[in-house]
């Protein structure tokens, strides 16, 4: 009788584990990103939830926020190798692997509203070509979405372009971003996001660029008190999965992955506009930061310098010129 009870217990355990009657155990899936407690992290969580839900538990997806799986560059390399299933990443951090995707970082390129940024990427011929190129590098881009426009957060007041000249700013390691700051006479420095708070606190850098939500949720206003609205750069994100991993999935699960990613982008558009407005209002209300607008004449100077500088440089770059041309065609079509 004891033997029967023992085997009954074993059989029940196996059934619970999904290893009998042809059932397959759930596949563990990790989705990484570099920030925490902000809209980007919330979208990571939603993507993971949708993967699990739409697959009826066949994919057991978990979000890993705050850079717990490594830096953006480390996660991207791991994803290309197939050891990380998915991630959410600023397109500028993809420039080392897919230089063409970094062209979303060209200054004064996209409209400022997050949903309009997303709409632009959906309609964009350049974006479609970027996705094709990324596929060849082992990266499947489900889609792009906009977080919002980036402006300047500094340790000192900024009322004119001359105020930032000679000053050290942290930028994403993307040639268009670095080029923009060089055009303005500032000094760009590439740095992982996890290092930014301490670097600002210690004065290793004196400024950064980011949308209000990131600045507020990551508490960067504690170490840099001046937010100057320039809205010079669009912050475009990508939802990625490993091509190697996706291609090995059954056809129905491949479709689940795409559906979950696209629905996560829809969710992103719903929350990002509100997140930016709420963060800016909160910082103003708390008096934790001085918010001002860069004068229009100074913005024109910045734009003109970029058009003669980094834009021309990227147009003349053999690897990037075709994408820049497509982007210019996209802009003309979008705003006609």
Where are the language model's segments positioned?
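N-terminal signal peptide c-region/cleavage motif recognized by signal peptidases
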Residues: 17-19
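N-terminal secretory/targeting leader peptides
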Residues: 23-116, 125, 130-336
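Catalytic cores of large soluble enzymes that bind and process phosphate-bearing ligands
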Residues: 122
């Amino acid at each position: 009788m004891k033997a029967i009870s023992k085997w009954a217990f074993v059989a029940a355990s196996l059934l619970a584990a999904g290893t009998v009657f042809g059932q397959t155990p759930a596949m563990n899936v990790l989705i990484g990103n570099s920030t925490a407690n902000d809209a980007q992290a919330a979208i990571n969580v939603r993507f993971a939830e949708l993967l699990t839900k739409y697959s009826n538990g066949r994919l057991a997806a978990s979000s890993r926020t705050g850079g717990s799986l490594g830096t953006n560059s480390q996660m991207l390399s791991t994803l290309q190798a197939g050891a990380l299933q998915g991630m959410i990443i600023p397109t500028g951090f993809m420039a080392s692997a897919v230089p063409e995707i970094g062209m979303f970082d060209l200054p004064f390129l996209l409209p400022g509203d997050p949903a309009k940024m997303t709409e632009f990427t959906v309609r964009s011929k350049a974006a479609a070509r970027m996705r094709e190129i990324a596929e060849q590098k082992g990266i499947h881009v489900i889609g792009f979405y906009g977080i919002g426009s980036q402006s300047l957060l500094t340790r000192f007041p900024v009322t004119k372009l001359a105020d930032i000249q000679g000053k050290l700013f942290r930028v994403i390691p993307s040639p268009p971003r670095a080029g923009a700051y060089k055009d303005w006479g500032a000094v760009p420095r590439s740095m992982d996001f996890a290092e930014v708070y301490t670097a600002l606190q210690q004065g290793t850098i004196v400024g950064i660029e980011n949308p209000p939500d990131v600045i507020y949720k990551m508490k960067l206003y504690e170490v840099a008190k001046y937010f100057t609205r320039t809205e010079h750069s669009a912050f475009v994100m990508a939802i990625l999965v490993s091509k190697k991993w996706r291609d090995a999935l059954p056809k129905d699960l491949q479709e689940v992955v795409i559906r979950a990613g696209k629905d996560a982008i829809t969710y992103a558009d719903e929350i990002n506009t509100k997140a930016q407005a709420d963060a800016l209002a909160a910082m103003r209300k708390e008096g934790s930061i001085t918010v001002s607008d860069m004068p229009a004449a100074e913005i024109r100077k910045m734009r003109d310098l970029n058009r003669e500088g980094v834009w021309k440089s990227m147009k003349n770059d053999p690897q990037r010129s075709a994408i820049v041309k497509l982007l210019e065609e996209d802009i003309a079509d979008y705003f006609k």
